Amino acid sequence: VGSEMCIRDSCNELSVKYGYEKLTFLEGDIADYEGVDQVDMVVTLHACDTATDYALAKAVGWHAKVILSVPCCQHEINGQIENDVLKPILKHGLLKERFSAIVTDALRAEYLEREGYEVQVLEFIDMEHTPKNILIRAIDIGKKGKNSKRIKDCEAFLNVEPTLGRLLGMQKD
């Protein structure tokens, strides 16, 4: 599910060409998508800001066996993060942006572990090609993580409430 019709059409043609009849690409907003009850694998590629969170929440809800997510811009945490101890980092826009991106993806990995996934955060392509080269790879192992307190402590320390936590019911725990 994505917003670029030309990419959707091209990807659908490739899936037919290579015999992947059950692989489909749709145009739309992932937050509103209700087309299936279960999927085997969810792949996100540069889903901007909280679109990644909506896709990850859908993947968890579908009990996807595999999640491959390449996040894009991580603006949400950048707009929320506050901490006097970290002022030397947060007072500089560029450093705050990069730190916020790392925090965002680290918390995403923690949420996925909490939901029963084994998670790796990897660099999947050389920095010379794109600075957005982080892959969050998650494999469903069916065993919920016991890291809720660690997540809550981190969020409280940074004064953040990420969308993925809300979507997965973390703020209620």
Segment roles from a protein language model:
Residues 1-7:
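Short, small-residue-biased leader/transition segments that mark boundaries at the very start
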Residues 10-173:
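Class I S-adenosyl-L-methionine
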